[in-house]
Regions:
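Short beta-strand/turn micro-motifs composed of small residues
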Residues: 11, 34, 145-146
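Glycine-rich FAD pyrophosphate-binding loop
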Residues: 25-45
Length: 215
């Protein structure tokens, strides 16, 4: 019998550990490299904990170019830029712009969807091997917005419809019925009924990491 192939993974977050476990199942010898211990304060420690296989619409989308100026000018916007770094980032930025076409967006979205469509069954396979009682809730995931028009969400809704994503565009009344404690400043939303979220991402991560160490 040949030697077991050795594989190294950089990063002891949820992606690194999950990939390591599936590689172990395939018979590979896996080593995870990370400067910090698994479960330390990083991305998989304090994120929202969403299991979101619907999130197949990429950032490289045509409408993002019209949104960027407003984001940069807003003091509370989600985008900030160090202006002395502009010259260094220009080659990357020009390449990004070239990818913000409908054709490139759909190419990325279709490939992301194929991968994400396998995510929940893959997590379920791993969770069958650990005790996660009460750590994962299957209540769906709700996105809401306060625009009076759906136009700001038309693109992503249409892309997900084309990909066959299970989504439900809902009215303010339906939002209130689902989440009566949210202040009614919203004008619409999208509900993904099969979405899940982790109550404690760190605990799930550490349970998966312990499973990795035992194999």
């Amino acid at each position: 019998m040949g030697k077991k192939l050795k594989i190294g993974i950089v990063g002891a977050g949820i992606q690194g550990i999950s990939n390591a476990l599936f590689l172990q199942k395939k018979g590979f010898s896996v080593t995870i490299f990370d400067r910090d211990e698994a479960g330390s304060p990083a991305a998989s420690y304090g994120n929202a904990g969403h299991f979101s296989p619907y999130a197949s619409v990429p950032i490289n989308r045509p409408d993002v170019l019209t949104d960027v100026p407003a984001m940069l000018l807003s003091s509370t916007g989600p985008l900030a830029l160090k202006w002395n770094y502009v010259s260094k980032m220009m080659p990357w930025f020009l390449q990004f712009i070239r990818n913000c076409t409908t054709k490139r967006m759909m190419y990325t979205a279709k490939n992301m969807h194929q991968i994400l469509d396998l995510a929940l069954p893959a997590y379920d396979e791993l969770f069958d091997e650990i005790k996660i009682g009460g750590l994962v809730e299957k209540k769906g995931i709700l996105y809401i917005w306060n625009d009076q028009s759906l136009k700001s969400r038309d693109l992503e809704i249409n892309v997900r419809n084309e990909l066959g994503v299970d989504q439900q565009v809902i009215t303010p009344k339906e939002i209130h019925d689902l989440e009566p404690n949210i202040k009614p400043i919203y004008h619409g939303g999208v509900y993904y009924q099969y979405g899940r979220h982790a109550r404690n991402p760190k605990k799930i991560l550490l349970k998966l990491y312990d499973l990795f160490l035992k194999k």
